[in-house]
Design a protein with these regions (language model features):
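Conserved Lys-Pro-Asp/Glu-containing loop-to-beta segment of HAD-superfamily phosphomonoesterases
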Residues: 71-98
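Short, well-ordered alpha-helix to beta-strand connector turns
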Residues: 6, 20, 43, 106-107
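Substrate-recognition element of Asp-dependent hydrolases with the DxDx(T/V) motif
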Residues: 12-41, 45-50
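A polyampholytic, Gly/Pro-enriched intrinsically disordered region
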Residues: 63-77, 132-136
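Acidic, Mg2+-coordinating phosphoryl-transfer loop and its flanking beta/alpha structural elements
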Residues: 23-28, 91-131
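Cytosolic catalytic headpieces and adjacent flexible linkers of membrane translocases
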Residues: 34-64, 93, 103
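Short, acidic/turn-prone active-site loops that include or flank metal/cofactor-
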Residues: 48-54, 114-118, 134-136
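Single conserved hydrophobic/aromatic residue that forms the stacking wall/gate
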Residues: 1-10
Length: 136
């Protein structure tokens, strides 16, 4: 089962599903790693770093905007071009201060199991701080 070992993550995903939200897994890792995880989790969309391939081999070159820091906001805007209204009421979850631009762009930012730098920012901005259990 995709939910096995994900505990609170799965519960929150189900909450979003019941609301009819579109679920996006966005990562600064390569799409070849993130896409299978997004599929396993039943995400509607996957946004990750695009890597060039030649003859089925990764070249080490990237293409497009990297989904890192401000690039995550750019890539989400590209994904939902013409549907900018989807930002209204949107939720974002992260553990890293590198995701501050994305968290500042959503309506409901959440710092989840945050690293110290994000914890400090979230406390200063009054964002919810959540500690999720990764095991049921």
């Amino acid at each position: 089962s995709p939910s096995r070992g994900l505990g609170d993550v799965y519960k929150r995903q189900e909450w979003h599903r019941q609301r009819g939200d579109e679920l996006v897994l966005i990562s600064a890792s390569g799409e070849h790693l993130v896409a299978p995880m997004a599929q396993m989790l039943g995400m509607d969309h996957c946004v990750a770093i695009l890597l060039d391939e030649e003859a089925g081999m990764l070249t080490g070159q990237t293409r497009g905007t990297l989904s890192f820091r401000e690039g995550k906001v750019v890539r989400i805007n590209q994904l939902f071009a013409g549907k900018e209204h989807l930002w209204q009421g949107s939720f974002g979850y992260s553990d890293s201060h590198n995701d501050l631009p994305m968290l500042q762009a959503v309506s409901h930012p959440h710092a989840v199991n945050p690293a110290p730098a994000l914890r400090q920012c979230a406390e200063e901005l009054g964002w919810p701080l959540w500690i999720w259990q990764l095991h049921p």
